[in-house]
Regions:
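Short active-site neighborhood of thiol/selenol oxidoreductases, capturing the structured segment around
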Residues: 35-59, 64, 157
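Thiol-/selenol-based redox modules, centered on thioredoxin-like
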Residues: 127-128, 132-186
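Short, thiol/selenol-centered motifs that function as redox-active sites or metal-ligating centers
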Residues: 51-61, 83-84, 123, 174-183
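Residue-level signal for well-ordered, solvent-exposed loop/turn and beta-edge residues enriched
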Residues: 17, 30-31, 110, 131, ...
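N-terminal "domain-start" segment that seeds a small globular fold
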Residues: 2-37
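Short, small/polar residue-rich loop motifs at catalytic or cofactor-binding pockets
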Residues: 18, 43, 118-120
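Structural microenvironment flanking redox-active thiols in thiol-disulfide oxidoreductases
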Residues: 58-97, 107-114
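Short, internal strand/loop/helix patches
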Residues: 93-127, 132-133
Length: 186
């Protein structure tokens, strides 16, 4: 059973409810950005918690690179959120992988904690009023040619952009932990 604090936090982020705003520095060193600026003049936004060293995140580099072309009416915020993943590691990944999407750095995982993120990648769809419409995986970690492939986030985006309610508003996550876990034997 979750602690009462965990239950309080979970209840503060219901689907359809408001998500907390944030302001983080981009890895590039430019001016701070937050949810409000990502949503500016957009119908909504996708926020993806991401890690430079997570192999699951690496798989979605191309998806994130093409996102703005595929969904020009939506903002995109990619948040580097992994314990002890410093700006140097993020900058190296950007250069080595020729990443063109901006990455915001959640240095102390404050935004990840506020948004209940414990693994990367984790995607959120938010409308222009900062209401949470979808949270979960980008897909079911199968490749598009697999008959069982399910592009969860794309389906949510299609529903939202066509003016329909998002049919599947939450999916289970998978990926790399944002924080180290140590097991101690006594």
């Amino acid at each position: 059973m979750p602690t009462s604090r965990a239950m309080e936090i979970t209840e503060s982020q219901p689907i359809g409810g408001n998500v907390s705003d944030f302001e983080l520095l981009p890895v590039s060193g430019s001016a701070p950005q937050g949810l409000t600026s990502i949503l500016a003049n957009k119908k909504g936004a996708v926020i993806v918690f991401w890690s430079a060293v997570c192999s699951h995140c690496r798989r979605y580099d191309d998806y994130l690179q093409k996102f703005s072309m595929r969904y020009p009416d939506l903002g995109l915020g990619v948040i580097g959120a992994r314990e002890k993943e410093n700006a140097e590691v993020l900058t190296k990944a950007i250069a080595d992988r020729s990443l063109r999407f901006p990455i915001l750095h959640d240095i102390n995982l404050k935004v990840a904690h506020a948004w209940l993120v414990c693994q990367t990648p984790r995607a959120f769809l938010i409308n222009a009023d900062q209401h949470l419409l979808y949270r979960g995986a980008i897909d079911n970690f199968k490749y598009p040619m697999d008959p069982e492939y399910a592009p969860y986030l794309d389906h949510a985006l299609e529903d939202f952009l066509s003016g329909q309610a998002v049919r599947r508003s939450e999916t289970p996550g998978f990926g790399c932990p944002t924080e180290s876990v140590y097991y101690h034997r006594n």
